A protein has these predicted regions:
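A generic structural signal for short beta-strands and their flanking turns/coil linkers
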Residues: 37, 52, 61, 79-83, ...
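Short, structured beta-strand-loop surface elements
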Residues: 8, 70-129
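General beta-strand recognition
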Residues: 62-64, 84, 166
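Short helix-to-loop capping/linker segments positioned immediately adjacent to catalytic or ligand/cofactor-binding
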Residues: 40-44, 97-99, 115-119, 139-146
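C-terminal edge-of-domain segments
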Residues: 1-12, 123-226
Length: 226
């Protein structure tokens, strides 16, 4: 797989409902992954379907997902496990001329494949990548993770070669109806000012303001106003 090759459409990844909304440009996949914060990971555990939320980061051609060694998914993944990671972002409410045609603007990516645990030095780098993705600059401001903390954390690595991306943007379909307002209401995730813990004796972390600005930029980038 290359980072510029289009996403292949297979029986597994093909969109059937509103199929014209499917995107095969790999840059669209990366846009969704960089804009989201949580992956909802679906898998089968003890014969039952499960979905859990996981923090993640992108590293090269893989999705790195953060979890606890006590979780059932970790036990299943020791030799690799098939799963689906879904990242969804709601970008707005679409007000059509009737409720049936009213909908959401959204970006959604589903990544499917065999996930394997990350170990050794690669695990350390993966944890750092997820930290830098969620809290840029924080890694260098705090004490390094202990061996016990590392042992209690597991990272799954999922290839990005099997993915389905679906994006809807803009106004409702159909012609306007006289006397009925139609259009859409944009939505973004906003990162607010930090709230210090009671009793701390420290200046505000140097990484905070740049991190907040960066996360807000990612949230608004699709609007074309950042």
């Amino acid at each position: 797989m290359t980072t510029t090759s289009p996403l292949p459409i297979t029986d597994e990844t093909k969109v059937h409902r509103y199929k014209w909304l499917q995107r095969t440009d790999r840059s669209d996949l990366m846009e969704v992954l960089h804009a989201g914060l949580i992956a909802h990971v679906g898998f089968v555990h003890n014969g039952r379907p499960m979905v859990i939320p996981m923090a993640y980061a992108v590293s090269g051609d893989h999705l790195l997902m953060h979890g606890s060694t006590g979780a059932g998914l970790n036990r299943d993944a020791k030799v690799g496990t098939d799963l689906v990671a879904t990242i969804s972002i709601c970008d707005g409410l679409v007000y059509a001329q009737n409720l049936f045609d009213s909908t959401l603007n959204y970006r959604c990516a589903m990544v499917m494949g065999n996930a394997i645990p990350v170990k050794g030095d690669e695990k350390h780098e993966a944890i750092k990548a997820i930290s830098e993705r969620l809290m840029p600059g924080r890694w260098d401001e705090v004490v390094p993770p202990t061996a016990r903390q590392m042992a209690a954390t597991f990272i799954l690595k999922l290839p990005l070669d099997r993915a389905s991306v679906k994006i809807r943007a803009g106004a409702p379909d159909g012609e306007p109806v006289p006397g009925i307002w139609t259009g859409y209401v944009p939505m973004v995730t906003t990162v607010l000012d930090p709230v210090p813990q009671d009793g701390i004796e420290a200046e505000e972390a140097a990484s905070l303001r740049p991190a907040i600005a960066h996360l807000n930029h990612l949230s608004r980038k699709h609007l074309g106003t950042e």
